[in-house]
């Protein structure tokens, strides 16, 4: 499975032409069946909708992908552990939400496609499979 982080989705939605946007477009055309969503990413994507039409379009996208479910008893604690491990290693993770997304990806064996330095840090200190397009 492939999780596309909000950082890469935003590049795609804005049609920036960045390497992240190009990779998301490639994944959607060549590996669509492998793309999954998770609620933390859905929350970030949907919170960026400025109008109802955009929100409706984004809801269709989010709801049209298989979802990697959050297991509260496992994933939130794993996210806290990732955050603490980064701090112990002298690394900075700016978003605890990225730790939660990483915990989900690790548990589900999914690869994260991103444009976010947090996932580079997390991949260095865990077994997160991450493809950076920064």
From Swiss-Prot:
Pfam families recorded: PIN (PF01850)
GO function terms (MF aspect): magnesium ion binding; RNA nuclease activity
Magnesium keyword on record: yes
UniProt xrefs under SUPFAM superfamilies: PIN domain-like (SSF88723)
Gene3D superfamilies: 5'-nuclease
Domain PINc: 2-126
Positions of Mg(2+) binding: 5, 98
EC number(s) stated in the UniProt entry for this protein: 3.1.-.-
Catalytic class of the enzyme: hydrolase
Domain of life: Bacteria
Upregulation: Induced during infection of mouse macrophages.
Cofactor: Mg(2+)
Keywords: Hydrolase, Magnesium, Metal-binding, Nuclease, Toxin-antitoxin system
GO biological process: negative regulation of translation; response to host; symbiont-mediated perturbation of host process
Family under the similarity heading: Belongs to the PINc/VapC protein family.
Function: Toxic component of a type II toxin-antitoxin (TA) system. Acts as an RNase. Upon expression in E.coli and M.smegmatis inhibits translation, cell growth and colony formation. Its toxic effects on cell growth and colony formation are neutralized by coexpression with cognate antitoxin VapB11; the effect on translation has not been tested but is probably also neutralized.
Protein name in the entry: Ribonuclease VapC11
Gene that encodes it: vapC11
